Amino acid sequence: MGLDVLTIPIQLTQAWFYLHYAELTGYELNLERDVAGRPLDETKTYIYDINEKGLRPAEQGDINANHIKLLRVLATRSIQTIAQIGGVEKILPEVWLVARQHAAI
């Protein structure tokens, strides 16, 4: 299920794939700590740091707690489970971009 189900947004399937691909190649995205090693804070916003391959706090960041929650679900759940989650379309473009940048594809 995923690529053959037209009701699942292609960006959702791709983001799921990118995160799992990065994990399989040994570069799992840290969704618990920022690039400085501090725990992620739900009140802060972040940007993806391509050089450090992680999230960096930034006042003008476009990644917030909701994006991080979806990234965590993508990294730990099956595409069948994720497809049942509603309301992700609003944050999916940013999540897709982070996953794609992290996988370096």
PLM-predicted stretches and their roles:
Residues 1-105:
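Non-catalytic alpha-helical scaffolds and adjoining flexible linkers that form interface surfaces
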